[in-house]
UniProtKB/Swiss-Prot annotation:
Keywords: Ribonucleoprotein, Ribosomal protein, RNA-binding, rRNA-binding. GO terms for cellular component: cytosolic small ribosomal subunit. This is Small ribosomal subunit protein bS6. The keyword Ribonucleoprotein applies. Binds together with bS18 to 16S ribosomal RNA. It comes from Brucella suis (strain ATCC 23445 / NCTC 10510).
């Protein structure tokens, strides 16, 4: 049997429990056709790069699969029918990655570094303040006391 990595994007308006139920449903389809599910990673609700079927966010789930090609094809057919599945991608790999995927590792490192998952923003609007790289302004002629 071949090894696959499968990423599933589910709609934003369903709950995490419904996403887990979807994964279990597809696990049943795969096992009925002679395949096995490996590691399942829920990456959570993440923003999409562009809108897909009027959704700006999606629940991402990574699944390691050990199955024949016919079982994967049947699972993908079921995913195309399901309205809660926005997109999916199945890639054949030589071996499954041990431990956490790069997505979860990067997110955990970022949280440890600054304690928050959101990027920092600069304070203020258009005025960014003095950067220290310019000399002080010289006064204009009318500011020097020669009023008009």
């Amino acid at each position: 049997m071949a090894l696959y990595e499968h990423v599933l994007l589910a709609r934003q308006d369903i709950s995490q429990q419904q996403v887990d139920a979807l994964v279990e449903q597809f696990k049943g389809v795969l096992e009925a056709n002679g395949g096995k599910f490996g590691k399942v990673e829920n990456w959570g609700l993440r923003p999409l790069t562009y809108r897909i079927k009027k959704n700006r966010k999606a629940y991402y789930t990574l699944v390691n699969i050990d199955a024949p090609a016919a079982a994967v094809a049947e699972m993908e057919r079921q995913m195309r029918i399901n309205e809660d599945v926005l997109r999916f991608l199945t890639v054949r790999v030589e071996e499954h990655e041990e431990g956490q995927s790069a997505m979860l590792t990067r997110r955990d490192d970022r949280r440890e570094r600054d304690g928050d998952d959101r990027p920092r923003r600069r304070e203020g609007g258009f005025d960014r303040g003095d950067r220290g790289d310019r000399s002080p302004r010289r006064p204009r002629d009318n500011e020097a006391g020669e009023g008009a």
